[in-house]
């Protein structure tokens, strides 16, 4: 028996008839997957929207010679806050993947349904695309002004599709002369591997040093740390952020914004890195004899006692009991 009574929101807060009717419709199994996908898209939107906005200030400020508009430090914080908002607002509905590599890892290691995984990944990429479109339109006047300034200076071709050009606000590019593809691969792989270890640790119910309420901050700090240390050599960390934003850059600037071979690194390397990190954590760091921390147990009980889940489980149990009580023909 739970140490505290199980009280659902509807027990203490009454909603209007319209909202109750809408909840009954949206929570049907045939429809609820769309709500989960909406939450995944919205979560990635938060992450990308705040990160790109800060990146736009950095890139445009440098082109227009306006100092103090942004910095790598600020960009790291912007992405970190976006992650906090994503987890805080959306994770209760979808589970809080917000990254295709996390969804793929959950599918392989934790039985996440493959069809649902495909839907999640599409939603994540869509969220990044929508965020890119909004950031572009909010910054459009200054982006166009920056492009004109680059053309007047005769450096448009050499700057536009680099981290220092307006297209670099959205799509990820190698810094010319500063990075090779093998080193970019190493940079991406190591950072994604470390980040995935942190995520897996935050999800470990025996991690008493990382209670559930702190997990969003730990994960956000890991993202920020990677950006602060390795954004300049070039880093992606999230396929949805990369693919969604690159598709938007292609929408605006055409094939020139594709990014060449480096785009494969930014879009794909985080997937094997995350899978390897999950294997390493499961093999070397998980200990089934450790005690489940009280805060994690409470979190697990809250998830398990979701009203619809409990009713479904009770219906299944009644069905099993009815089946077992019937005499089977010999």
Curated annotation (Swiss-Prot):
SUPFAM superfamilies: Aquaporin-like (SSF81338). Residues 312-330 have a biased composition (Basic and acidic residues). Residues 1-40, 93-124, 179-183, 229-264 are cytoplasmic. Residues 62-71, 146-157, 205-207, 286-330 are extracellular. It holds the Pfam family MIP. Keywords: Membrane, Repeat, Transmembrane, Transmembrane helix, Transport. Belongs to the MIP/aquaporin (TC 1.A.8) family. This is Aquaporin Lacbi1:307192. Residues 308-330 are annotated as: Disordered. A motif (NPA 1) lies at residues 99-101. GO terms for molecular function: glycerol channel activity; water channel activity. Its main location: membrane. It is found in: Membrane. Aquaporins contain two tandem repeats each containing three membrane-spanning domains and a pore-forming loop with the signature motif Asn-Pro-Ala (NPA). Lacbi1:307192 has NPC/NSA motifs which is in accordance with the fungal aquaporins (NPx and NxA). The keyword Membrane applies. Water channel-like protein that does not show transport of water nor ammonium across membranes. It is a multi-pass membrane protein. A motif (NPA 2) lies at residues 238-240. It comes from Laccaria bicolor (strain S238N-H82 / ATCC MYA-4686). The chain crosses the membrane at residues 41-61, 72-92, 125-145, 158-178, 184-204, 208-228, 265-285. GO terms for cellular component: plasma membrane. Induction: Expression is induced 2-fold during ectomycorrhiza formation.
